[in-house]
């Protein structure tokens, strides 16, 4: 159970900190509204303008729809039309009407036609939050994405998600990814809440058991990202392209933080649903967090969390990405809620001090998305400021219980 009997002063109980988070969330939302395009939502530059040649991708559209839905549930006016715009895009130009599923972007915008589990997880998350927000057409989108996930991506045999297929589903990529399964875990927690079907919690546990307890547990709780279709690790994957934005070489401390939080959400969700939990969930979350801090934070002569590590836990890509630090703060908050231990309060404050000092851009809006190894603004991996999802969630998670999932928690749904 959550432990709120802290014997120390905690920012999680501070009304002033709650107010600061709320104001930062509203600031982020205000910046992101300019991302609207005909076919969904695109990427913004450093100054909040649509980037030159910006197109509406499924990932960004789904994430924005999810965020605006959460804001609407919070009671922030001005988001309803943006949710509906996202639903229309995900139900229209981003959707494959012939074969089912979702493209990476509309065909007229030259989107990739393969069907990726990663993108479908975000469509499911967006649809779930839009249903909680009570938006028209949200339920139809939710039913559609559930059918695709269950019939195409979910493998009962593997207890995990298949990675990707060709447009007509005839060819499958011989690869399994921890990243797509991580975001599927997040989506499954939301699906369990909006459908009332605890089967999604069993599926999420199956993923966590495979990716975290088995594979990461055997690797000192450093998350292995890349596998064959038979779930054999691929340690050299993308060695020649180590800074890939979605499939980088080595291990990614930011994902360890994200997994740590999701493991605790899963534990709380299953307890709330009356499902039994294995006794290793909390310990796995602790180990993930501890090793991400040990090997990722302040390891190259400057504060901040490096993007990637090699198999000897030495930095490879030393850039600091904003999403990594959002997830670090959110994971610290989750562990603090769960355990009541001061070490997590200390880390929580540490990460937010770093974020406020170096990532939050008061002058031009939103957050800088990337710093180099000297903690100077950089655009080597992520140009502009396209992302709302990570930073906005980082302002919400610390003030909400570990279960239910975000939109349902803000709506006060049991």
From Swiss-Prot:
It is an enzyme of class 5 (isomerase). Optimum pH is 7.5. One of its GO terms (molecular function) is isomerase activity. Keywords: Isomerase. Signal peptide: none annotated. Its EC number is 5.3.1.7. Gene3D superfamilies: 1.50.10.10. Monomer. Belongs to the N-acylglucosamine 2-epimerase family. This is D-mannose isomerase. It comes from Pseudomonas cannabina pv. alisalensis.
